[in-house]
Curated annotation (Swiss-Prot):
GN (gene name): JAL46
Keywords for the protein's UniProt record, in alphabetical order: Lectin, Repeat
Occurrences of domain Jacalin-type lectin (ranges): 2-143, 146-291, 294-439, 446-592
Disordered: region residues: 1-20
Alphabetical list of Gene3D superfamilies matching this protein: Jacalin-like lectin domain
Record organism: Arabidopsis thaliana (Mouse-ear cress)
Gene Ontology molecular function terms on file: carbohydrate binding
Disulfide-bonded cysteines: none
Protein name, as recorded: Jacalin-related lectin 46
Stored Pfam families: Jacalin
Database matches in InterPro entries: Jacalin-like_lectin_dom (IPR001229), Jacalin-like_lectin_dom_plant (IPR033734), Jacalin-like_lectin_dom_sf (IPR036404)
Amino acid sequence: MTERSEALGKDGNRRWDDKSDHDDVTKIYVNYSLMGIESIRFDYVKSGKPIEGPFRGETYNTYTHTFEINHLKNEHLESVEGSYTQRGIQTLQFKTNLRISEPIGYPGKDGIKFILAVEGKKIIGFHGSTYFRLYSLGAYFTRVTPTRIEAIGGKVGTKWDDGVDQAGFTKIHVRSGQEGIQFIKFEYVDKNGRLRDGSIHGSIYRRGSPHVFEIRHVDKEYLVSVEGYYDGDGDCAVIQALRFRTNVKTSQLMGPKTGKKFRLAASGMKIVGFHGYAEKNLTSLGGYFTPIIPTKSECQGVTERSTLWDSGAFEGIRKVSVTWRSYCIRCFRINYENDGKVVKRAHGMNDDSRITDEFVVDYPYEVITSIVGTMNDSYVTSFVFKTSKGRTSRTFGERTSDSVEFVIESKGCAVVGFHGWYAPLGAGYITALGAHFYPMPLPPAAEKLEAQGGAGGVPWDDGSNFERVRKIYIGTCEVGIVSVRFLYENDIEEIVVGDHHGNKNLLRHEEFDLDNACEYLTSVEGSYDVIPGSEDVEVILMLKFTTNKRTSPCYGLDDDPTFVLHKAGHRIIGFHGKSSNMLHKLGIHVLPITDP
């Protein structure tokens, strides 16, 4: 059911309406000047097809700001905040379930604030009015439907569905037996914060092994995935084992590793409900998922007679840079991670004549978890950043005698954005600071070992989301290794084909095949040197691979190894490196070797 809000602002003489027959808003274009928001345009998506909307208002002599919403990653527009005067809409700021845009426009002294939002719903269309510029804005809302992943396993027994009216889980009860999972039961917290005891799905009238997995919902712990095994033919299959993972911890495997492996998970989302089939055993299990939502802290510092700024929320932070003088922070710069791209933001006055230093974060293996700062009655005087690896940055600025300490953090969360205030009229110093937080995921289980080889080439990384290496393709020529390509196996036994790294037009091509699930890669030997006839181009000359069972032939030139990629007690599950039309460097991702 679609809900239409009233258009807020001043009434312009040209009314417009984008209607509500869209699935999501995908991109917003805002043209603005000192007079206010001059024009606006919205792009939408409907049944997977993009729809470009027209500009509403005039576009002469304006600044332009765009804000993209990635509906393919379950991002949707939740609200619009702004202000208006007699001259129309002056400022706008857009909030999705994942991020917040920068404030757009220039706030007037007598501006009236407004917000377009309906709890539990998303915006799918806009309407409003113009009179040369944008005068009013309203929206269409529809309910956000959780993503349903169909039940995996058999379909024998009673179909059950716990629904999606819960905010999270507190406890999961499972009993396993010789024939599979006998029953499962969930304890929930509803959206009003009340505990709710779920129904038993399966049979309780047999002996088995009980398992209980507790989830601390009050500490912002939430369920992100379920994996397990099912065995049997078609609709008669039975769930044999289950393992639950939250953003904080992973349960033991409840039951034996028997049959085919499966996983219930969705990137950037958490589980809010389950459904499936059960008879005397649990025969199948499916889930409902909703996006994980960032939170915003209050600002620490002085907000009076200052200008508001807000970077919004991103995937992570790669680097912070701070410029300061003896008594205040002058400029705060942040490099954010946004879907594989670096987004740069700067707040305050960029003054290169002052002291500047930076703090680099090893994202995604490291995140900022808190900021310890000091402030006096006028401005922020110092910052210190702390990370998930236990690192602490230097002190940016000075802790003066009249300063008071403050801490910005949210337990179990990572900092994914900053907001605050700075002094106007050319002063530029930071007067207040706050942060956007996102529940902290488990750090990548794999360890990334530094690549070995020569300089040159473009970086590449196959990642570490694999269980083992299945096959290696090596391209060689008379001067060394031309290219490599790896086939991997993921945790549900699917084959993942990696990219070609190097020259695809191979002169000679060789393969090294790992036999079965019991064989895994433990080390790589290699050598590198300058290409004959070149002064500085270093390439990999030779590679040799060792598994827990055997050693491969020597690929490339017959050369003595100059490096070894290996970590004791670990197996190789991924590769990274640098390449051009040759292979320049090679590195590995490793996991600890565990008993089968």
